[in-house]
Amino acid sequence: MNVIKISPRGYCYGVVDAMVIAKNAALDKSLPRPIYILGMIVHNKHVTDAFEKEGIYTLDGPNRLEILNQVDKGTVIFTAHGVSPEVRKIAEDKGLVAIDATCPDVTKTHDLIRKMKAEGYHVIYIGKKGHPEPEGAVGVAPDIVHLVETEEDVERLDIEAEKLIVTNQTTMSQWDVHDIMEKVKEKYPDVEFHQEICLATQVRQEAVSEQAKKADLTIVVGDPKSNNSNRLAQVSEEIAGTKAYRIGDLSELKLEWLDGVETVAVTAGASTPTPITKEVIRFLEQFDHEDPSTWKISHEVPLHKILPKVKAKT
């Protein structure tokens, strides 16, 4: 089968940095145990499973505060999505060692919110409700940050502040953000704009919007909790006009999706391990509609291949 390997795809620098930070923590014998990650370090189950094998445990829950309530000792790692100042303070009050793996692009948004609050602004924040990145951002200044996910949410806003700025979750689709920002401008004509689509997210979305046009089908390799992976599938369908499916790994690929397909495009979310994507590409490249011997789907990437290699400190 013809395979278009969409480029760029896969890991971004923020994800790699977060994984290296966590891997170094696993190797650092001076850190108090146990070591916990507050939520998924990045939104990919293969990564969290691999870290558990390294002795780093992922804790889950509806929000970071409730997750932190599960921890009474040891070390906590804040994920790439960032956390609120309240979470940091509680971790400190509990006497926990805290390691920060927040993506620098997320930190920029937190800094912006602090600056805007100091200058008397209210902030409209476009993001996905229930996602940890907006949770952390809103938590920076909950009294002046208003979370919206849809144009309908914008219509329900009732903000009387004279100074208003709109920003967004870094992994949103730039097209989604544009439409919601236009709605904000319609309701609040004097609003200021500060779009925060991270460059890695933007170039991956743009690559899909152009390169997927040449395919009959797009396969996005990414975890169901990965917002940027889900957005890539959305971009393929809504912008490139190409049907898309998101899969966690090769085991989730359905052969019936390939019926009548001559060319398939493959991309991956920013938190998807490269070996997982390569396995999908290899299968599709050898797949032949006429040869049943090429139809067997078998996911075989071992956990020790998932994490970046880091040298132990001497």
Curated annotation (Swiss-Prot):
Gene Ontology MF: a single term: 4-hydroxy-3-methylbut-2-enyl diphosphate reductase activity
Binding site for isopentenyl diphosphate: H43, H81, H131, S226, N228, S271
Gene3D superfamilies linked: 3.40.50.11270, 4-hydroxy-3-methylbut-2-enyl diphosphate reductase, catalytic domain
Lineage: Bacteria, Bacillati, Bacillota, Bacilli, Bacillales
Record's protein name: 4-hydroxy-3-methylbut-2-enyl diphosphate reductase
Cofactor details (free text): Binds 1 [4Fe-4S] cluster per subunit.
Tagged with keyword Cell membrane: no
Disulfide bonds: none
Family: Belongs to the IspH family.
InterPro entries: LytB/IspH
Cofactor(s) the protein needs: [4Fe-4S] cluster
